[in-house]
Swiss-Prot record:
Domain Peptidase S1: 21-258
Protein name in the entry: Inactive serine protease 54
Subcellular compartments: Secreted
Location, primary (coarse class): secreted
Amino acid sequence: MAEMRGMLLMLLYISHSSSAICGIQKATIADKLKENLVSSTEFPWVVSIQDKQYTHLAFGCILSEFWILSTASALQHRPEVIAVVGISNMDPRKTDHREYSVNTIIPHENFDNVSMGNNIALLKTESAMHFNDLVQAICFLGKKLHKPPALKNCWVAGWNPTSATGNHMTMSILRRISVKDIEVCPLRRHQKTECASHTKEPNNVCLGEPGSPMMCQAKKLDLWILRGLLAYGGDSCPGLFLYTSVADYSDWITAKTRKAGPSLSSLHLWEKLVFELPFHESNIALTTNSFSIHTYAEWPHSYSQGQRMSTKSNKQKDAGQNFRVNRQPETSGPSKVAIQPMYYDYYGGEAGEGGAVAGQNRLHWSQERILMSFVLVFLGSGV
């Protein structure tokens, strides 16, 4: 009976695994590339949010096949936006990048474009994103745990400012810089923001842009977790910066996606087992897409998208990057757009100096082991 139950659970989980697995990347070693470059299979959840002229507006992170988390400030007055995925290497001669039309944007209802409080937004793609080695979802904590999981290898990723473009970012290959949380922070913070600092001596330029993700690994699981979205600072390395704490918005995310559909997978039981039990009880490679939140923001826009084009130039526009890619975006017909608040670009991403690369854990869990671990936890919990 137990074996039959386990097999049924396995089949059920496999049937939903495309949306349940998160925080796993193919890269298994620390790539010691020059200038803190990110290898092609690292950070497969980072996307570029662009307007219809293919101008880069902000970064975002994939939470599921349909949902992306980004900043509200960069998405005001943007009637048509797309998500370009698999952006670790933007060289069109080597990589063909897929675009997905965004048909719904849900900014936080209390977003303040003056103070930049609650600067967070959900984006829903019109069609499901196809996951592969270059495109995956990242995990995030589905609630505030009594004992938060220990994290390691925290990085911020972004485009690299160059002398040729000044403060503008050059879209080529993502860079990464090691960062750490700071308990005593001299910066003025809003509620639900945290303070962090670059960790190494000043050698390289810093990476700062709206929505630049701060990503860490959970020590017990080696799964990647979206810790935050860059909010302010990062002009110099080493230096302080603020980021929007994603964990503080987990209930909001769950509620919004549940109401808009499809809802994000909520695995709070497994999250509790994995993160709150002693290590010998929780040393399981469980992927926790801990998301969800409700209440619909008053900014549910529908967007249409034009054709996919090949990357040919990096012309700057609106202090962003202008580029084209090769395929037709996953899209449907246009629909009317609601009136949006005034657009406010709050972060210029000025170049600084310094930074370094944090090491990356070498352990890589196969999906088969993850699925089996999930079933073992399920059976052991008596659910």
